[in-house]
Amino acid sequence: MLLKFRSLFIVMIPILCWAGACDKNDNGAPVGDMPDPIKIDLRSTEKDMVSADQAFAFEFFAELFQEEALDEDKNFMVSPLSLSMALSMTRNGASGETKEAMRKTLNMDAFSDDDLNAYYKKLKEALLKTDPSTKLSIANAIFTNQSINIKPDFIHTNQSFYDATVKAVDFGHPATVNVINKWASDNTNGLIEEVIGGTRPEDLMYLLNAIYFKGIWTSEFEKKNTDRRPFTYENGIRENVDMMKQTAKFNYTADENMQLVQLPYGNEAFSMMVLLPAEGKKVQDAVTATRGEGYWEGLKSGLHQAEVELSLPKFKTEYSKRLNEVLTKMGMGIAFTNGADFSAMSDAPAKIDFVKQDTYISTDEAGTEAAAVTTVGMMMTSLPARPEKVVFNANRPFLYVIQENSTGAILFMGAIKNFD
C-alpha cells in the first residue's frame, strides 16, 4: 500500500477525544514492552457525550477552516478538547439563555451540568493513566478580579470537577499579565509563552485550559530515510520538504473522499490519524465529508491492517486565533453581548470579552510534541460604583469617638482643639 503526501492534508491527534485537568502523566517511559492501554469503561450516557464531543470537534474545525479559507496555504491547528473544557468551566457560571446557547454550541444540550462535569472528571483520571510512555498534562486555571466577589459555588464546582487552580489578582497591576502568561508557559513545557498582552481593571476573570502532549511513535521513522521530496500545494506549486519514509504495518482505510492512516504512539493508546484527500479532491472536500452525521465513525470502522509504504513530511505549526466570530456562528453569540447572563459566576454584570486559542505542534522522526492553551476573558459590562473621592484634611479642631463597631458602644470620646 503506497501512501505519499502529495498535497495538503489534515492531521488529528485524538487524545482519546476527551478531557482532563490540572494533573499530568510525565513518566515519558521508553517505548518497548509497554503494558496494554487501560480500557476506559463508559456508561451509555457517557458514550453519547463522546459522540457529541466529536461532532462539536468536526463542526468547530469546519467553521474555522471556512474562516481561514482566504489564506489557502496557511497551516493551522486547534484543540477542540481544550476549547470544550475551557467553555465548560465558563458554562458553570452562566444562567438562562446564555447557558443554553453555550450548551447547544458545545453540542451538549441533551445532558445535565452535573453529568457533564462528572464526565470530564472521570475521563481526566483515565487519560493520565492509559499510556506511561506518553507525556500528557491537562491543566485548568481561573484568575479572578480581587476586587469582585465571585460566587463560591462556581469556584467549588470548577475546583472539584476540573481541578482548576483559582487565584485572585489585581487586573489593574501591569505585572498581572506576567503571572497569567507564566502559568500558560509552565503548563505547556514552554511551548506557548504568551496568551494575553495585558489586563484591565474591568476584567472579571480569565479561565484557561492548557494541554501538553509528547508522544513517541510506536514505529519510529529512521532519520537516514528522510530526504528532500516535493510537496504539491493545491494551486499546483511544488516545494521540496523534509519527507520522512518507512514501510510498516498500520491501520488503513480509504473511501471516495480520502485515505486514512493511523499512526500510533507508545502503547497505542494515542494515535495520529492522517487524512489525505483522494486524488482530484481538496482538503475542503475532506472537511465537508467529516461533518456528515456518523461519517467519522463509519470511516474508522473500515480500518484494517495493511503494509503501508508511508511518506509523511516533518512539520511544525504555531497558531493563534480569537474565536469569537466562529463561536458566534455556532450559536453562542449572546455570551459576547451585554445581554449575557453570567449571574452564577458573580453578581457583577459580565460577558465573554474574547475566546482565544494558541497552539503549537512539531512532528518529526521520533514523534509529536503539541500544546494548546484556550483563554476565556470575562469582562464586566458595568463597573462597580467607585467610592466617592473626597478630601478629609484635619487641619483644624475636631472631635473623635472610639467605638465597638458591631454594637456602637462608645469607649472614648474627645476633642482636639489645640497642640500647646
Show the residue positions of the predicted features.
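Structural recognition of the beta-strand scaffold that forms the well-ordered cores
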Residues: 77, 85-88, 141, 271-274, ...
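Short Gly/aromatic-enriched secondary-structure transition segments
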Residues: 102-106, 221-228, 283-292
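A structural signal for short secondary-structure junctions
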Residues: 266-267, 352-355, 391-396, 404-406
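Detector for small/aliphatic-rich hydrophobic stretches
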Residues: 2-9, 16-17, 22-171
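Non-catalytic, conformational "gating/processing" segments within enzyme and secreted inhibitor domains
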Residues: 73, 113-278, 301-384
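C-terminal or internal capping secondary-structure element at the end of a domain, subdomain, or sheet
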Residues: 397-420
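Extracytoplasmic/secreted cell-surface and envelope-processing proteins
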Residues: 98-102, 282-284, 319-321, 371, ...
